[in-house]
């Protein structure tokens, strides 16, 4: 898939980091020809697929060769799977996450019928993973808080299905449930767990969890944004552009354990372009010898698409 760059700064329509990226792309030398910063191919680990057409355009413009997709506010397991059938670069994950109004009561009463639904979805062989499962998610605009134990019957059932079908699981678990998440990882050492946004943990907790749990993968979606709407502490950037050297050091020490993502949700072309531009800027700061693993290799291996 050949990436298409914005032809003018106004095409990107985004402030901050995305505009800086576009400005760099469009810098003109004396002979009048544009200098184009090469787009780094990457596999996006985190997309809420609300608009498949917008997603396809964004992937082409910003170098995403593949994307893990699951539902958003305007989609479902069925619509995600339909899109993936027509766009083979999309990697569908099945979700029964409790933020869904229809599913939350089942989580509250530990209803095994919901696990049977997930089992039926996975038995089709069409899905390459499970998630995003927001077991413990702080409240946000339009998103009610969820707070279910990673050791509870529902998460345990999900992990057992992941083991049965040999699939990775993406979980959103905040640091308030860190001990239970650690215990879950120990209980299912053979199940790869993708930690969405790395639980927004600080550096020392990221290092500790990765050292103690070899089946844990730290996913960086929303951590590379210049600003995060929930907390300025959630970004790993020290000034909106440069990654903290300590974070780069950890990522390059453990390159097989990190994934990149956009957390795209297709609210607007401008907001999504910011997210994709932030991934490109982050990847440029990683040394080339380890960049390919973080950008693509780790995720494609987890979902069975590695060459």
Stretches with model-predicted labels:
Residues 4, 8, 14, 28, ...:
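Mid-to-C-terminal alpha-helical segments outside catalytic/metal-binding sites
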Residues 43-47, 67-69, 92-95, 129-131, ...:
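Hydrophobic faces of well-ordered beta-strands that scaffold small-molecule active sites
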Residues 47-87:
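N-terminal carbohydrate-binding/catalytic regions of secreted carbohydrate-active enzymes
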Residues 48, 72-73, 95-101, 133-136, ...:
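Active-site beta-loop-alpha junctions enriched in small/polar residues
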Residues 55-58, 79-83, 114-121, 154-158, ...:
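A general structural detector for well-ordered alpha-helical segments in enzyme core domains, enriched
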Residues 74-168, 225:
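Active-site gating/metal-coordination segments in enzymes
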Residues 145-259:
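Catalytic pocket-lining loop regions of alpha/beta-barrel enzymes
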